[in-house]
Amino acid sequence: MIDKKFIGNLDLVRSNFKGSQIIVSTWEVQDNIKTNLMKNYEDVIFIFNKDIGSISKDIDGIKFVTNLNRMIVSTYNGLISSSKKISIKIRTDSYFYDKKIIYFLDEILRKNKLDNVDVISRMTKFCVFDRYVINCNLFARNPHSHLPFLFHPGDILFAGLTSDLLKLFEIPLSKPKIIEKRISLKNICYMRYSPEQYIWVECIKKINGGRYVFEGNFNYTSSDIVKSEIYYVNNFIPFDTKEIGFCWPKHSKHYFNKGRLSIYRRDDWINLYRKYVIHKPIEYSLGQRIRGLMITSMKIYFLIRNMLLRFRFVRRLTYRLFVKRG
C-alpha cells in the first residue's frame, strides 16, 4: 500500500519544481504498486533498490538500530541517475512548500555570493567539494553547544552540484562496529559516528590520503574542533527550513524540535567565515549572546544528566522511554 503522506509530499515537490527532473530512490515494492506509481507519475523517475537492511547491535540490554547504509545506497543510486548539473537531496517524508531554494542556489553557485558576502572565498586545502553545498541546519551540530558532536552536518537536505553530492555519498557501507558505547563528561552516545558524521568523515577521508580526520565521538582535542569548523565552513552553508521553504514534519512530531540550540545558524557560519577564511574579528549580536547563556544552562543540565546516565539501570530506562533515533 502506498503511503498517502509520501504521495502528498511528492505532489508538493512536483508542483513547486515543474519541469525539473524528479527522482525517487526507494526500496523494492510489489509489482502492482510499481505499475501504479509509474503510470500516475510519468514525469518521475523511480528507482527500486534492493533493501540491504539496517545495522543493529545490543548494548546494555538495549537494541540500537541505524539505517545508515540504507541512506547511502538509496541516495547514491538516485544521484548517479541524475542527468542534471545541480541536485537537491531530501527525504521522502519531507517536502518543499515553495521554491525559494532556487534563489539561493543561483546566488551561491552562479553568482558566488551570499547575504552580505559579495564574493565567497574558500581555503583550498580544506575544500572537499568544488562548490559550496547548501545544508539544512536540522542536526548540523555546533561543537560548542551542549551536543558537542564534531564533523556533524545535517543529513536531511543537501543541495548543490550533483558531482559534489555524489562525492558525499560515494563511500563504503558502514559495519556493525559503528555502534559502540561512547562516554564523556559532556555526553553519552552509542555510536562511534552518527550517520551524519560517518558520511562526512568517510567523504573527507577520500581526499585526506585515506586517513580519518576524526577518530570518533568524544575522543577529540581542541585542534579537532578547529578542523571540524574549518571543514564545515569551507564546504557547507547552513540554512534554516523557513529560508528555503522546506518542511520535515518528523522533526516536530517525533523529535519535538529538540536540539534547536545545538545547531549551526547563519550567524554562526558568518563568524566561522570571518575567523578562519577572511581573518576578521568575530561579531556577536545580542541574540547570539542570549543564546550563549541558554546553551550554558543546557550544558549544566547535560552534565547532571550524564552523571546519572553512568548508572546502567538509569540508561536502560531513559533510552526505552525517550530515545527517538533507531
Predicted segments with their positions:
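Short, well-formed alpha-helical segments that are part of the catalytic scaffolds
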Residues: 2-16, 30-33
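A short acidic (Asp/Glu
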Residues: 6-8, 33-36, 59, 98-105, ...
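Hydrophobic/aromatic residues located in beta-strands of well-ordered beta-sheets
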Residues: 21-22, 46, 87
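Catalytic phosphate/metal-binding cores of nucleic-acid and nucleotide-processing enzymes, i.e., regions
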Residues: 24, 71-74, 105-112
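Active-site-proximal specificity loops/subdomain of glycosyltransferases
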Residues: 25-81
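Short beta-strand-to-loop acidic/aromatic patch adjacent to the donor-nucleotide binding site
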Residues: 84-97
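Catalytic core and acceptor-binding pocket of nucleotide-sugar-dependent glycosyltransferases
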Residues: 96-270
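Membrane-proximal basic amphipathic "stem/tether" segments
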Residues: 257-326
